[in-house]
C-alpha cells in the first residue's frame, strides 16, 4: 500500500489519501467573500481556494469538524457534500445536515472499508472550539477532531478546529502512538 499523502488545499481543507481511501477535511471552496453571521457579526474570507471543489472528486468521505461556521464548511463545501457518500461530523451536525451525514461523539469509532478491502477506523476525538471552560461548547457549538488508523499504516491525528492544549494532552494520554 502506498504511503499516505496529505495535501493542504486552503484553510482547514485538506485532501488525504490513506489506506486506499480518498478523504477531505472541512471543505471550503468559496471565492473571496463576506459571510453575515447575524447579530451584526460577519466573517471575511480574503482568498478563495486554489482549486474548484469538483477537482477533489470522487471522495470516499468528508471528515467535517463542525458544520455551523462558514470558515469550516462554506457554500461550495455544502454543495460538495451531496456528491460524497459519507460525511462524518458531530452529532449536532448530523441533525442539521441530514443526507449522508453521520454524527459521532468523542471517542466513538466508525469503520470504512476501502475498495482494496482495507479496514480504516475513524475515531472522533474531543476538540474545543474556543477557550477552555465548562460552557464553551454550549456557546460555540460542538466540534470534533479525527484519528485515522489501519493495519500497516501510520496513525494520523486531525485536530479539527481544536484550540485547547488541554484537549491535546488528554488525547495523547489515551492514544500514545500518534
What is each stretch, according to the model?
Residues 2-52, 138-160:
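Conserved beta-strand hairpin/beta-sheet module of binuclear metal-dependent hydrolase folds
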Residues 3, 86-154:
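Metallo-beta-lactamase
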Residues 10-12, 68-70, 93, 128-129, ...:
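Short beta->alpha connector loops
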Residues 21, 83-86:
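A short helix->loop->beta-strand "cap" motif at the edges of active sites that frequently abuts
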Residues 21-64, 75-79, 130-133, 162-176:
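Pre-active-site segment of Zn-dependent metallo-hydrolases
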Residues 73-83, 93-94:
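Metal-dependent catalytic neighborhoods of phosphoester/phosphodiester hydrolases
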Residues 155, 175-178:
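Active-site beta-loop-alpha substructure in enzyme catalytic cores
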